Amino acid sequence: METMNHICKLAGKCRVAGQEGHCSVFCTPFILLHGVEGKTGLWGNMNVPKKYRNCDLSNLPIKASNPVAYAWVSKYVNNVLENVQEGVGLFLYSIPNADNRFGTGTGKTTAAISIANEFMIARVIEASKGGRPIVENPVLFYKASELQTLYNSRFAGTFDMKEAADKKYYKIKKLLMNVELLVMDDIGIRQKITDSFENELTEIIDARDNKMLASIFTSNLPIEKLADTMGDRIASRISGMTEQIAFKGKDNRRGGIL
C-alpha cells in the first residue's frame, strides 16, 4: 500500500512516516488533516490560497530582510499552541520607503500564513495524542477585501442571489467570530469603509477580543493610520489585542518570492 508521507504535512513530525502498514490513507491524523482522499480535511478548509499552502517557519523568506520580524514569528511558532490558546494576537504592518512606497510584498502575508500552517499541524498532533479535541476547523484565513465584497453582495442582484449571499455571509461571520486562530489579511487597503460594514467588522473583532481568541492581522498601514480607512473603534481594538510587528524592504512579489 502506498505511503502518504509525500503529501502529509505531519510527516516531518511523525515517527512512522513512510513506514508501510502505518503511514497510509487509513491513518486517523492524516484523514483529519487531509481528508479521506488527501485533498480536503482541515488543511483544505483553512481558505489559504494555494501558493501559500506549503509555507512554514523553515522556508519563511524574511530572515535576512526583516530579522526582527522573523524573530517575532519564530518565537510565536516555537510556542504556538500556548500563544493561540492564550489569545496572543499579532498586527503585521509595512514601513514604506523610497523603493517601496506602498510597503507591499515585504512578507507579511507569508509570515501570517506560516504561523497558521504551523498551528494547524501542532493542533492536529495535540488532538491525535488525546489532547483537546477538534470540533471545528481551528484556523481560518480571510482577506478583508473579500469579506467586504461578500457583505456588499447581500444588497445586489436578484432576490435569490441576495438570499444566497446573505446565508454565506452569516456562515462566514460565525466562523470569523469563533475560530481558534483567525488570519485577516490586508485590512485597510480600501477607501474609508461604510458605517454599516464598520459595525459588522467591529462586532467580529469584539467577539474575538471578549473570548480571548487569537487574531493575526496584516496591513500596509501602521496602526495609527488604520483609523483613516477602518475607523477609530476598529483601530483601537486591534491595537489593544495584538503585538505590532513592522516589516520593511523591497517588494519581493516582483521576483515571485512572496
Residue ranges and their predicted role:
Residues 1-79, 244-245, 249, 255-258:
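A short, basic N-terminal segment
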Residues 59-64, 97-103, 150-153, 189-192:
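Surface-exposed cleft-lining segments at the edges of enzyme active sites
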Residues 65-74, 102-106, 110-111, 116-178:
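Short glycine-rich substrate-engagement loop in P-loop NTPases that contacts/grips substrate
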Residues 85-86, 135, 176-179, 210-212:
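Short loop/turn elements that form and flank the Walker-type P-loop nucleotide-binding site
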Residues 85-113:
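Walker A/P-loop nucleotide-binding motif
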Residues 87-91, 138-139, 181, 216:
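Residue-level preference for the first positions of well-ordered beta-strands
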